[in-house]
Amino acid sequence: MLTSPLRQDHLVPETLMADASPIIRPETPPDLHIPDSQATVKVSIIDTTSYMSNFPMWAFLDPLMPGHEEMKGCDFSFIIEHPKSGNKYDTLLFDLGVRKDWENLPTPFVQGIKAGGCKIEVQKDVATILKDNGRDLSEVGGIIWSHWHFDHVGDAQTFPGTTDVIVGPGFKKAHVPAWPTDPESHIDEKAWQGRTLREIDFAAEEGKGLKIGQFDALDFYGDGSFYVLNTPGHTIGHLSALARTTVDPPTFIFMGGDIAHQGGEFRPTPYMPLPAEISPNPFNRILPRPALTCPGEIFVEIHRNKSRTEPFFDPTTAEGAWHHCAHEAKRSIDKLTEFDAYENIFPVIAHDNSLYGVIDVYPKPANDWFAKSWKDKTRWGWLNEFDPSFAGLAKASEP
């Protein structure tokens, strides 16, 4: 594989920072064994206009951090276009965000959301966003659901019956039939009525046995331009995807869905240690007088293990959490870190608020993300979700 490991050349083990904290050289990540290819897909990141707030963070992450008790924010999905696949899937969607009329979701879900005081706002559904930009919805051959949760399945009924719904392994056994046939289900079975519900079986599909990194993979178009990845844990059959965005240099976008809910679940790592100086300053949007850079040491001080090489969070194992299996989710996240270690692979998880103001969204393409340094500009942006008044974080502001 032509991808090269992320190098942080300012991290040299023989030197010390001014506060005498050791500086750590990144470890070399394992080869991901991505086959060479001259084929790419066009990718755009869709701002689904969904905004969720007042969801309890304890139901997603552990440990809780000061100022980080609420899960809130955006919801990204993707449109993938293959120039000449020769099949109905020339245009794909990966996730749909939240349906605009979310109160028409299954009754048990809506009742639970309202009882919990959670808030959901949606300006437009993805179908409307596409039509507003001149797209013919009949061109969309399939919708890949990363998983079945409300903020990813959208409303498939806004697409014609020729658009398939594509799900991960185990979905049908776990979730079919759904609401209203199963009155306790949180999934509306009308999503796949009158259309094909395709469940990917990584063991049986053509090219079985393929692995990209440690993930079971499906070469979706058969030309190395787009891989669907098996990333279970958050739910049964959770899917991610890897899209080749350029050939020279080879670059990729990792479409994460909810493989993680916050950057601190997969950063820092031995492959990507917390740097001595973080640039740009993650607090530059919320502090009145932010310094240009931010000392990494202030975040080490609030890390659960005072570590520069371990993620800040794990998927929570608390009763009532939103994960099907937190331990399996953690294993998928650990596999993700090997992808994130490469400078030319850009993981985009659905709820990464730090991407706003940096990335281009649909209808603009995302294929030039590497040339525009989106990963460099957003790698540590999630740190701004911590309360800057907590402990030593005030050092992020100018004196």
Curated annotation (Swiss-Prot):
SMART domains named in the record: Lactamase_B
Its Enzyme Commission number(s) read 3.1.1.-
One GO term of the biological process aspect? secondary metabolite biosynthetic process
Give induction info. Expression is induced in response to 2-benzoxasolinone (BOA) exposure.
Residues engaged in binding Zn(2+) 1: H147, H149, H234, D258
Q: Which domain of life is it from?
A: Eukaryota
Annotated signal sequence is none
Keyword field: Hydrolase, Metal-binding, Zinc
Residues that bind Zn(2+) 2, according to the entry?
A: D151, H152, D258, H351
Deletion phenotype: Impairs the ability to of metabolize 2-benzoxazolinone (BOA) and thus growth BOA-amended media.
Q: Which GO terms describe its molecular function?
A: hydrolase activity; metal ion binding
The record's function comment reads: Gamma-lactamase; part of the Fusarium detoxification of benzoxazolinone cluster 1 (FDB1) involved in the degradation of benzoxazolinones produced by the host plant. Maize, wheat, and rye produce the 2 benzoxazinone phytoanticipins 2,4-dihy-droxy-7-methoxy-1,4-benzoxazin-3-one (DIMBOA) and 2,4-dihydroxy-1,4-benzoxazin-3-one (DIBOA) that, due to their inherent instability once released, spontaneously degrade to the more stable corresponding benzoxazolinones, 6-methoxy-2-benzoxazolinone (MBOA) and 2-benzoxazolinone (BOA), respectively.
What additional remark is attached to this entry?
A: Fusarium verticillioides possesses 2 unlinked loci, FDB1 and FDB2, necessary for detoxification of antimicrobial compounds produced by maize, including 2-benzoxazolinone (BOA). The FDB2 cluster arose as a duplication of the FDB1 cluster with rearrangement and expansion by incorporating additional genes.
What is the protein's given name? Gamma-lactamase MBL1
Q: Which source organism does the UniProt entry give?
A: Gibberella moniliformis (strain M3125 / FGSC 7600) (Maize ear and stalk rot fungus)
**What does the organism's lineage look like at the top?**
Eukaryota, Fungi, Dikarya, Ascomycota, Pezizomycotina
